[in-house]
A protein has these predicted regions:
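Cys/His-rich finger/ribbon microdomains and the adjacent scaffold used
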Residues: 59, 65-68, 156-173, 177-184, ...
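Short secondary-structure boundary/capping segments
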Residues: 104-108, 213, 241-246, 301, ...
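Charged, low-complexity interaction segments
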Residues: 192, 197-247, 259-264, 270-290, ...
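Repeat-solenoid scaffold signature
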Residues: 180-186, 432-435, 439, 444-448
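A cross-kingdom feature marking solvent-exposed beta-strand/loop segments within repeated
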Residues: 422-427
Length: 536
């Protein structure tokens, strides 16, 4: 038993670390409950809780003498911070010590309600033993657009995670699998596909979706509406809706009875609704669905629902741009579920269901979907404008300010920006761009701007030249080593500096790397390290 003021709690089931400040001189872990200090205290400042009332204490220290060699009473201990590890944590504070929407498993904070406290204690009894959990996500740092060279780009997964399982780790992110609860929100918002949903896998969800819709269409169904719900609160909501159908809300007969689900509404259970991203949404319509509605029960973190609505906004914009009328994707609140489904007008469907399968690589699945819709529709739109934040788009480069320093090429994690071995060129493959903005923040000339859009032609997969310049040849050997604009800019800025005012230092900036070394070694006017020998 320890006492004191808790400073912080971290960790997860079986590995919590609690740090606290010892506020009372008596250490309950060492105390033997001999009552010697209680009898010795002349002010009666110690009761049978074996904690000293410091307002009554007059510092006689008789309790210290009474405790003797046991050493449980130490007035110098109060200033010491302590740490210990615990398997489970029951937090009875008025305000939880861990302020997360989804707290770690094994941490319970029932508040000050006695019933909730009793239920929490009962739940703790079931958290004893050995447990296994899947690793819900896979992370490929090579294509992660979080950062490069200390510059921050994409922070989507960090912003959406409600468990604190994802943290920045230099130019990449680090996922703590013990804290991850498998919502899949990080994989949904990840623009590059660096974060993928490993359990359950998207190919498995896609195959289940494809089979379900194929069976429905073969049976003569039409205008299918996929109703996505989670395996807990969402499932309970649908069961309650079914029980209420035909019997009224109070069980008093058919008058005022609920209607249940429309025949075209097909429930689709997933682990968590945050895992439903653009690949699933567009895949459902490509497989023959008219619409997808996702049931939000109110238990989800607000950030997940907001991210889901944003993904739906991107997907709706793309389908509208291709001529598919109607609202294909939306979130339905639990209290309005029945009414919203019955009032829902069907949206336009595809002519013939797609045959491709959803892949674990989100960008690949989306490429398949875009190609399919472009071939299926009669509106052959080649370019669709997208709202800011979309994971597709182009770049514009200000050719007047760009010096082709190529810093943006080194910063791009998706190989969307390329160099040319033949000439000073900045080339761009639009299909690879995820609009992370690293090129914008890295550019020293502030010459790059993002253009969110979706290009549906073959040009999106081909390199295009954004800027090119006249090469600059070394004034000593004639070898090209940069652009004329870059060298002129460099000499113009450094020409007035004292280090380049004398000798051939300024001219040396117009030489390639090898010639600079040769020129410095052969010049008699340049100071040598030997010139400084013996100086203090």
């Amino acid at each position: 038993i320890w006492s004191g003021k808790v400073l912080g709690v971290s960790g997860w089931l079986g590995a919590f670390e609690v740090e606290w400040q010892q506020e009372n001189p008596i250490d309950l872990e060492i105390c033997t409950r001999c009552n010697g200090c209680v009898r010795a205290c002349p002010e009666g400042a110690i009761d049978f809780s074996y904690q000293i009332d410091l307002d009554k204490c007059k510092a006689h220290r008789e309790c210290v003498k009474a405790c003797g060699a046991i050493g449980a009473v130490d007035f110098a201990r109060a200033a010491t911070a302590r740490k210990e590890n615990f398997d489970l944590v029951l937090d009875l504070s008025r305000e939880p010590l861990i302020r997360l929407h989804d707290a770690p498993q094994g941490y319970l904070a029932p508040g000050d309600d006695p019933l909730e406290q009793a239920l929490a204690v009962h739940k703790l009894l079931g958290l004893v033993g050995e447990f296994t959990k899947p690793r819900f996500t896979q992370y490929r740092e090579r294509i992660c657009a979080h950062g490069r060279s200390g510059k921050t780009g994409c922070t989507q997964c960090l912003d959406v995670c409600s468990t604190g399982a994802i943290r920045a780790d230099g130019d990449h992110v680090r996922v703590e699998p013990h804290l991850c609860t498998g919502c899949g929100g990080c994989a949904t918002v990840c623009p590059s596909g660096a974060m993928t949903y490993a359990y359950p896998r998207m190919p498995d969800l896609g195959m289940r979706l494809k089979t379900m819709l194929a069976t429905y269409l073969e049976a003569g169904g039409h205008d299918a509406c996929i109703l996505v719900h989670d395996a807990e609160a969402g499932r309970d909501q649908l069961r309650a809706l079914g029980r209420r159908a035909g019997f009224g809300e109070r069980g008093l007969g058919r008058k005022g009875a609920g209607r249940g689900l429309p025949a075209r509404a097909i429930p689709f259970e997933c682990f968590h609704i945050a895992s439903i991203g653009m690949d699933f949404l567009l895949g459902a319509v490509a497989y023959g669905a008219s619409q997808v509605r996702v049931l939000a029960t109110g238990r989800e973190a607000e950030g997940y629902v907001a991210a889901l609505r944003e993904q739906m906004s991107f997907a709706n914009t793309i389908l509208h741009g291709l001529g598919y009328e109607g609202e294909h994707f939306a979130v339905i609140e639990a209290q309005a579920l029945e009414q919203a489904l019955w009032q829902l007008a069907p949206a336009r469907t595809v002519g013939k269901p797609a045959t491709f399968n959803l892949s674990a690589d989100k960008r690949t699945s989306l490429d398949f979907a875009f190609d399919f819709f472009f071939k299926d529709t009669t509106k052959k739109t080649q370019e669709i404008d997208l709202p800011p934040g979309a994971p597709f788009g182009a770049l514009t480069v200000n050719k007047d300010t760009c010096t082709l320093c190529k810093a943006c090429i080194g910063a791009c994690p998706e190989a969307a920006l390329l160099d040319s071995p033949e000439a000073p060129q900045l080339r761009f493959i639009e299909r690879n761009c995820v609009q992370c903005g690293l090129c914008v923040t890295t550019c020293p000339e502030d010459a790059i701007r993002l253009v969110p859009r979706l290009l549906l032609t073959a040009q999106a997969k081909e390199p295009v030249t954004l800027n090119e310049a006249e090469p600059f040849n070394c004034v000593r050997c004639g070898k090209p080593f940069g652009t004329k604009k870059m060298v002129d800019n460099m000499t113009g800025r450094l020409g007035t500096h004292s280090m380049f005012a004398t000798g051939g230092a300024l001219k040396r900036l117009q030489m390639c790397g090898e010639c600079r070394v040769i020129d410095m070694a052969s010049s008699k006017n340049e100071p040598s390290i030997l010139d400084y020998t013996g100086r203090k």
